[in-house]
Amino acid sequence: MTPPPIRFGYKASAEQFGPSELADLAVAAEEHGFDSVFISDHLQPWRHDGGHAPASLPWLGAVGARTQRVILGTSVLTPTIRYHPGVIAQAFATLGSMYPGRIVLGVGTGESLNEVPLGLAWPEQKERFARLKESVNLIHELWTGERVTFEGEYYRTDKATIYDRPADPVPIYIGASGPAATRLAGRIADGFITTSGKAPSLYTDTLLPALRDGVEKAGRRLDELDTLMEMKVSFDTDRERAMQDTRFWAALALKPEQKAGVEDPLEMQRLADELPIEQAASRWIVSDDPDEHVEKIRTYLDLGFRHLVFHAPGHDQQRFLALYGEQILPRLRALVGQG
């Protein structure tokens, strides 16, 4: 089997822009040479002021109609609490039928701020993981069978059929930041998603070994999977501007214990705004020099990630896309032999 090609994608900042502007940015990403566009699926954003949270499912359908070649997917959607897995199976089968070969379902265990505000219980991590595993198995069954009766611990179906589905099932990627979900991705998923800007040892000593372990236990090869790194990058010709742009996304620099149990965007915003700019920017590759920027990105290619999806924090995303299209993507493609 041929390994997936190296791809460079764009993360549409759904927590920062409304749906129409975000769709325009996705179209621009294709025009500037990006290979994919991924969107999160939040009910609520990380901050209240200036925050947005468009629904990913209608947005993907609309953007599919306005683009020609980019892969479109979620990074990530939680198919376990506010959605029944069967609803997600139907939605992505429809998207896959309309845009064959271009749709990816990226899933994860989720965030409490997207579930608790709807009056839904937020389970412990062990249950969230079990729900994710069961939901992926159910989605696979619904995509390959007919009149599916499923009796799981958390979900059930009774002679359910997804009537409209693509010739080839939509790939499922599992997002993870810990070993258990990463191992699960290696066992049952078509791809693995994680995020940049954390301790290097997390990738070298924990996540990648867990991924290889899952792949080997399933009798698969690692190069059968698409390994996607969501890259946190802030690139501008003005380094100070690149640094200050990270402020909007300061919540990403909060430690897990700092944001545990925080479901209100106003409270998340308050906590994030207390961080000094150096900490707010700590997850991001902040650069004004293209060669320096590419060299830092190269670290993740050297780890073996084959699909880098770039998430920029600034408010002027058209500027980012133009700068990346002109200065960064050509260097990256030359680096991997695509120039």
From Swiss-Prot:
For the ligand (substrate), the binding residues are: T195, K198, K259, R283
EC no.?
A: 1.1.98.2
Active site (catalytic residues): H42 (proton donor), E111 (proton acceptor)
Q: Name one GO molecular function term.
A: oxidoreductase activity, acting on paired donors, with incorporation or reduction of molecular oxygen
Q: Mind listing the GO biological process terms from this record? A: carbohydrate metabolic process
Enzyme class (EC, first level): oxidoreductase
Q: State the InterPro entries in the record.
A: F420-dep_G6P_DH, F420-G6PD/mer, F420_G6P_DH-rel, Luciferase-like_dom, Luciferase-like_sf
Q: Which family does it belong to?
A: Belongs to the F420-dependent glucose-6-phosphate dehydrogenase family.
Q: How does it assemble?
A: Homodimer.
Q: What is this protein called?
A: F420-dependent glucose-6-phosphate dehydrogenase
Origin species, per record, is Nakamurella multipartita (strain ATCC 700099 / DSM 44233 / CIP 104796 / JCM 9543 / NBRC 105858 / Y-104) (Microsphaera multipartita)
Gene of this entry: fgd
